[in-house]
């Protein structure tokens, strides 16, 4: 019964970290982000959290009891995390986060509120077999 708890904690951390990084990109720009904040060491933490969130999220799927839009958001969040893993693991393997420059700055303007909303949504997911938490 731990997979839903682990998913909830790691997914919230992933989305809050994504929110913080994208907001930082908006405020200081991609050049300073890569030079001062978003290093391969940060990517190690980010990639590990994503891997744990993806594994525990897929393991929790059969116990998901949330319905309607929240169920759709669960799928969206889980697929987003899962598909993002190769990008972030690659940064660790090649020891570079310079790929950030590939994305236009407005991308972060979209990602920032989306990641904050996803972090909140993850806290609302409910799973069979857990208490009223």
Task: Give the location of each predicted region.
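Loop-to-transmembrane helix junctions at the membrane interface
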Residues: 56-83
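Membrane-interface helix-boundary signature
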Residues: 3-7, 11, 35, 39-42, ...
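Interfacial non-cytosolic loop connecting adjacent transmembrane helices
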Residues: 28-44, 85-110
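Hydrophobic transmembrane helix segments
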Residues: 13-54
